[in-house]
Every structure is written in structure tokens, then in C-alpha cells.
């Protein structure tokens, strides 16, 4: 049987984050979601988690750090409206350096990708390299993230893990350190070698 690629000569090249690392700063945000504001990024689940935390009268600061693509703004406008209703700060169309600084002021990134976290998620790598604890969903390619992110099976499970973290912040230090080490090895310079 003939294949398109010779597997002995083919290698999968991992990705790295385009967001640089930044020294950790005084906390400004408890939780953020960031990336391109478009469908299929888990933004609705992030907003749902914020809404549930607000219902429980938990004090926290949240932000949506996002890039609004120029084509169809109807989805972005809906998300912006929902964030505003939940008192989630909107930080739109920031540079990579600005995003790095914002992440350095953040505790948790809620990144519930519908297909689960995987090595192709540059936003998760950007959070990890900036020492932000990543909360995401399990997926088919999530096994290597079991010890470097906090994974849930669905949004309710993720919410319970966020609530646990809020009350036990020190219990996740090892995961955060491991995530930083993982992401540090996944920079473009290392990949190019």
C-alpha cells in the first residue's frame, strides 16, 4: 500500500506560542480567557463560568483578552455584550507584548476548547509560559496535559475545579511549575533546532 508520506522521514513539528513570557507581576485578574473572538473557542463556557461565580457572590476580577477579526462582528458583538453584563473587563486587539503583560497579572486562564486541550493550542502555551494556571476540557489529545493543566470533563466539572482553586490556591503550585517547564521547552528557538 502506497502512502503519501514516508513515516520514517516525516516528523510532526510542534507549535510554540507567539506570546512572549513576562515576569510575574502583582495580580490584577483572577481569571481570563484570551484569543481570537470567534465560535468554537470555548468563550461561551468561559462566560457561563463567570455567570455562575457571580451567582455565588464570589469576589473576582475577570477579563476577556481578545482579537476581534474584521470579517463578521456579529458574534464578537454578542460576546462583548455578554461580558459587559457579567462585569468582565474587555481588553481587545492588544499587541503580543501587552497580552504578555496582562497574563503576567493573571492567576487563571479558563480555556475550555470544545475538542479539549492539546499541543496545538497556542493560547494555552502562552498562558503557561506566563505562569497562568490553565483550566480546560479533556479531549482526545489531552493526556500529556493531565499534570500541567486543570482538566474537566464538561463545564460543570470545570466550574467545580475553579471553585476549588479559588479556596485552595496553593494546592496547584506544582501543576503551575510543571506547566511552565513544559511551555519553556516549547519555544520557537527550541523547535527550530
Question: Which role does the model predict for each range below?
Answer:
Residues 31, 46-49, 62, 127, ...:
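A structural motif in glycosyltransferase catalytic domains
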Residues 66, 76-97:
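Nucleotide-activated donor-binding/catalytic signature segment of Leloir-type glycosyltransferases, i.e.
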Amino acid at each position: 500500500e502506497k502512502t503519501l508520506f514516508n513515516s520514517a522521514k516525516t516528523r510532526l513539528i510542534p507549535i510554540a506560542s507567539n506570546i512572549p513570557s513576562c515576569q510575574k507581576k502583582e495580580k490584577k485578574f483572577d481569571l481570563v480567557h484570551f484569543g481570537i473572538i470567534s465560535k468554537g473557542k470555548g468563550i461561551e463556557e468561559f462566560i457561563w463560568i463567570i455567570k455562575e461565580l457571580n451567582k455565588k457572590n464570589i469576589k473576582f476580577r475577570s477579563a476577556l483578552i481578545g482579537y476581534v477579526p474584521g470579517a463578521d462582528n456579529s458574534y464578537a458583538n454578542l460576546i462583548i455584550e455578554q461580558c459587559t453584563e457579567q462585569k468582565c473587563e474587555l481588553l481587545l486587539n492588544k499587541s503580543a507584548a501587552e497580552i504578555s503583560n496582562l497574563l503576567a497579572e493573571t492567576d487563571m486562564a479558563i480555556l475550555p476548547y470544545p475538542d479539549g486541550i492539546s499541543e496545538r493550542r497556542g493560547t494555552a502555551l502562552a498562558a503557561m509560559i506566563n505562569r497562568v494556571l490553565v483550566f480546560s476540557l479533556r479531549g482526545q489529545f489531552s493526556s500529556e496535559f493531565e499534570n500541567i493543566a486543570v482538566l474537566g470533563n464538561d463545564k460543570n466539572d470545570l466550574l467545580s475545579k475553579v471553585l476549588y482553586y479559588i479556596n485552595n490556591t496553593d494546592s496547584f503550585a506544582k501543576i503551575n511549575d510543571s506547566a511552565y517547564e513544559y511551555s519553556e521547552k516549547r519555544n520557537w528557538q527550541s523547535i527550530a533546532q
